[in-house]
């Protein structure tokens, strides 16, 4: 027998008027938030956008979306240090999406299929000179060509690519991969003039009839270090070593090679020395591992190939076949201090990898140009120097020195150059708030192991064959589908199914959903189930 009385309470209308009892205090709206991968990409790629296309197997559309921001995906998939993956929310769940591996897959597939980028604008009648064919110069030239401008790159070297060609070993970046992506930029009408060192920018600007100039010569000169070296000592810079190897002129280093420094370039130099026949490649660094500049995986790869590292040691003297190091010790603040204890190390060659600087003296006499003490050029938010129509970027300006940062500079400069040429200043669109892991609703997700790239066995790493392989199409698809689509709706229909009032209508593929506030009770069922936080609940405005 049921002892409960029947429910005699009236049905309360919660959406249109204030009544006695509950009212709707909030209602849902669809939002777009900024994924952390997008936020941290130095090239400004819309990573989530091209990943969503890759998830659907729309490879060409994904590549076209990617190259709106970066013309070198096959290169970046190999050499970028992928800060996007360090920020990836999926790392809180199991492991980051291998964004760089998918980017590489798209770049390699584009080369294999012969895909070409579209032009976005009619010819403008304007000409732009780009000085330097490195990543920043190539990026700027590509973007300017897409915007309808006539572009010529002039570079002092015999081959385009800058430090991509002469600073990154082929076991990390095969030269055919690099040249294929550069050739695609050339196919857009960009003229690349080699063996042409620009020494008078203003004269070349006037002589060539250029309307603007972008200078991106990079930082290809080794920093001077004051270490006593005897006449018979064989000392080279890491910059010159990698340059010579890239030019096909491998030097003879001997059986024992010491590399001084612990940045990424030092790791490349030591691994290159092993490939050139050195029986022993020893990295010497004045501090400890926690303070090295190289990425941890770079050091691990070097160690796996037999490179040795001697920490807390500072070179004091270099002689023929040997060098003297002083042992260091960290003080209470973590700063290396000399101990007065010395050791002698045997070495046929010493490679100095202590940083690089830009050779910018040819710019110092141009009115309006301002240089920092280390030779970098000061630019404004629009990438323009103090000289009207003269822009600069890449390693030539202060800031982080990576390939991806340089490409981002080139894109940004191109957009500002375009605005300057058209007298329509470029303004970047405002960014949405960033969505963190705590804002996601992920119970529906299960662990999905990442797709691993194959590695060349250590025993076979004697030459400059590429060490890391690419993903198969199936693995690339799996990896793309690990993306959580943080902050942006991917039309999973979860909200549509969860609404108890049928207040949510589907607008069709690619158009999202719409909330009928006449039916919505503000229960937040849609918000609470949305896995990617593409829905927010906002307070209801109730008339006084």
Regions found by a protein language model. Name each.
Residues 122-123, 127-131, 179-227, 316-324, ...:
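Feature captures the FAD/FMN-dependent oxidoreductase FAD-binding
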């Amino acid at each position: 027998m049921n002892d409960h009385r029947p429910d005699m309470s009236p049905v309360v209308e919660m959406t249109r008027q204030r009544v006695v009892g509950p009212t709707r205090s909030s209602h849902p709206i669809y939002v777009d938030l900024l994924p952390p991968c997008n936020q941290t990409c130095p090239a400004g790629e819309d990573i989530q956008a091209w990943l969503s296309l890759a998830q659907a197997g729309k490879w060409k559309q994904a590549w076209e979306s990617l190259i709106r921001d970066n013309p070198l995906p096959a290169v970046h998939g190999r050499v970028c240090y992928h800060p996007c993956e360090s920020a990836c929310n999926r790392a809180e769940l199991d492991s980051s999406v291998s964004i760089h591996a998918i980017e590489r897959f798209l770049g390699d597939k584009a080369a294999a299929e012969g895909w070409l980028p579209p032009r976005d604008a009619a010819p403008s009648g304007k000409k732009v000179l780009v000085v330097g064919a490195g990543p920043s110069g190539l990026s700027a030239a590509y973007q300017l060509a897409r915007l309808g401008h006539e572009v010529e790159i002039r570079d002092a070297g015999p081959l385009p690519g800058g430090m991509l060609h002469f600073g990154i070993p082929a076991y990390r970046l095969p030269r055919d991969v690099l040249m294929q992506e550069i050739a695609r930029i050339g196919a857009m009408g960009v003229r690349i003039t080699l063996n042409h060192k620009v020494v008078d920018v203003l004269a070349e600007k006037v002589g060539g009839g250029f309307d603007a100039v972008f200078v991106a010569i990079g930082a290809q000169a080794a920093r001077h270090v004051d270490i006593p070296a005897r006449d018979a000592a064989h000392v080279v810079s890491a910059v010159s070593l990698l340059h010579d190897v890239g030019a096909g002129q491998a030097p003879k280093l001997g059986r024992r090679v010491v590399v001084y420094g612990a940045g990424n370039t030092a790791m490349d130099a030591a691994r290159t020395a092993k490939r050139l026949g050195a029986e022993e490649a020893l990295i010497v660094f004045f501090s400890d591992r926690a303070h090295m500049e190289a990425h941890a995986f770079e050091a691990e790869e070097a160690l796996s190939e037999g490179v040795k590292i001697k920490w807390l040691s500072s070179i004091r003297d270099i002689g023929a076949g040997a060098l003297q190091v002083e042992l260091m010790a960290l003080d209470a603040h973590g700063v290396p201090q000399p101990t007065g204890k010395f050791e002698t190390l045997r070495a046929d060659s010493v490679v100095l990898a202590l940083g690089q600087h830009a050779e910018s003296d040819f710019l110092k006499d141009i009115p309006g140009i301002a240089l920092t003490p280390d030779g970098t050029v000061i630019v404004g938010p629009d990438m323009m120097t103090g000289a009207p129509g003269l822009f600069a970027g890449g390693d030539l300006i202060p800031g982080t020195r990576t390939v991806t940062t340089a490409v981002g500079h080139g894109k940004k400069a191109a957009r500002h150059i375009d605005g300057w040429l058209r007298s329509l200043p470029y303004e970047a669109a405002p960014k949405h708030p960033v969505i963190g892991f705590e804002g996601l609703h992920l119970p529906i997700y299960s662990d999905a192991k990442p797709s691993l790239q194959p590695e060349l066995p250590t025993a076979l790493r004697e030459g400059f064959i590429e060490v890391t392989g690419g993903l198969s199409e199936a693995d690339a698809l799996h990896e793309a589908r690990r993306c959580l689509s943080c902050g942006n709706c991917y039309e999973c229909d979860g909200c549509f199914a969860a609404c108890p009032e049928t207040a949510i209508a589907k607008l069709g593929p690619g158009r999202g959903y719409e909330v009928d506030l006449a039916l919505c009770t503000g229960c937040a069922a849609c918000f609470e189930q949305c896995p990617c936080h593409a829905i927010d609940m906002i307070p209801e405005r109730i008339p006084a």
